[in-house]
Each structure stands twice: as structure tokens, then as C-alpha cells.
């Protein structure tokens, strides 16, 4: 159980995740809810990407510790970046998942499907990849996935300024959106980790203050 929110700005992206996990049994009941340990997050930098997932912890493990994503040319953006994600990134992701034995075992689902929603940022552009490996981007630049996504997405739209927010504003509303989700969704909870990806590229920087982690990546 997870909530991840993201904001697409002009030349930057902000991704923010909670730290709560739970096991769901066959009846749909949630078993003991726990919090990820120190140094762990549902989002991580992998090469030039920020990668996160809502669904199975196994998907997060593979994304962060096994998957070697293909690197797009540094100047790739727009439709050419879309094509790269479609033709290069997603096939590599699917191959990695299948090699690791991760996929859908639910009756009626195609073998190609898996059980998590994946969110990524590359070149300060956000993509959300569904269980069937299709991807989408939001025209307004606001994203939320996971068990508390409805609460978080509503909060993002209410809190967002009329114009595209600057990075500091985007980080603030992302944290507030997660806090709103945590109030109404038992599967969402602190500490919250915030990641920033900006263009032009800057050297990675990771600072921790209280419950927030900030990363700047190429």
C-alpha cells in the first residue's frame, strides 16, 4: 500500500513518496502495516532515471537493485523521448521483470502483464507505466498512484497555483498532498521522501532534513 505523487514543472519534476507498506491477503484484508527502514524508499535514482512503483514491493526491489535501464541521448525530449520510452525502455523493463520471475499470475491476465504501477522521471519528464506496459502522461502535470492516490490527486489540484509552480512550491504541495492522503488512507504514512530532477543537468545531491529527502539528478 503506497501513495506516490509527482508534479511536472517547466524544466523540472518533483516526485514524493510515503514509506508505509502492508501485506494484502486473498480476502483483501490488510495484514500488519509497517514502515520502510532507514535508507529505503519507494523511489530511487537508477542511472539518469528516478524510478518508483506502487503495488508489489518486489517490483520496487527489482527497479532499484537489478534493472539497468537504457540511457537516452542527453538532448532527447518530446516525441523522440516518448518513442525511446516505448521502443527501448519498456521492452528492457519487461525483459528484466520476466527474467526475475516477476509478472502476473492472476487468472485471465495476459502473460505480459505485471501487478504494479510504475512512475518514472527522465530528462525532467514524467511517465506512468501500467500493468500492461502501456504508458501515459498527464496534460496538467499532476500525478498520483497507489492506495491513497484519489485523495492525493485531489489535494494537488486544490493546492496548485494558477500558474506552473516553481520547484519549492511543487515540493510543498506534494508533501501536503501526501499528508492529506495519509489522513484518509491507512496504507499511506510518513516519513515522506521528496526527489527533484532538473534541467539543465546538475550534479546529484542528496540532503536529508527531518522527514524529507531531496535529490537532484542529471
Residue spans for each PLM region:
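Conserved short S/T/G-enriched processing/targeting/catalytic segments and their helical context
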Residues: 1-105, 110, 136-172, 184-205
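Low-complexity, intrinsically disordered Gly/Pro/Thr-rich segments
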Residues: 176-182
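Catalytic phosphate/metal-binding cores of nucleic-acid and nucleotide-processing enzymes, i.e., regions
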Residues: 109-125, 159-176, 204-218
Amino acid at each position: 500500500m503506497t501513495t506516490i505523487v509527482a508534479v511536472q514543472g517547466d524544466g523540472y519534476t518533483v516526485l514524493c513518496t510515503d514509506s508505509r507498506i502492508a501485506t494484502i491477503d486473498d480476502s483483501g484484508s490488510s495484514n500488519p502495516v509497517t514502515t520502510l527502514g532507514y535508507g529505503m524508499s519507494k523511489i530511487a535514482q537508477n542511472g539518469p532515471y528516478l524510478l518508483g512503483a506502487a503495488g508489489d514491493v518486489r517490483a520496487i526491489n527489482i527497479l532499484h537493485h537489478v534493472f539497468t535501464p537504457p540511457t537516452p541521448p542527453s538532448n532527447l525530449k518530446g516525441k523522440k523521448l516518448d518513442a525511446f520510452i516505448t521502443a527501448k525502455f519498456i521492452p528492457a523493463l519487461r525483459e528484466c521483470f520476466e527474467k526475475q520471475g516477476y509478472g502476473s499470475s492472476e487468472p485471465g491476465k495476459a502473460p505480459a502483464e505485471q501487478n504494479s504501477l510504475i512512475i518514472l522521471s527522465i530528462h525532467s519528464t514524467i511517465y506512468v507505466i501500467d500493468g500492461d506496459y502501456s504508458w501515459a502522461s498527464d496534460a496538467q502535470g499532476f500525478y498520483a498512484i497507489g492506495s491513497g492516490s484519489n485523495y492525493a490527486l485531489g489535494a494537488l489540484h486544490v493546492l496548485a497555483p494558477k500558474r506552473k509552480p516553481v520547484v519549492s512550491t511543487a515540493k510543498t504541495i506534494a508533501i501536503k498532498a501526501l499528508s492529506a492522503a495519509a489522513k484518509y488512507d491507512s496504507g499511506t504514512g510518513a516519513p515522506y521522501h521528496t526527489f527533484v530532477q532538473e534541467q539543465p543537468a546538475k550534479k546529484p545531491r542528496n540532503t536529508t532534513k527531518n522527514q524529507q529527502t531531496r535529490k537532484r539528478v542529471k
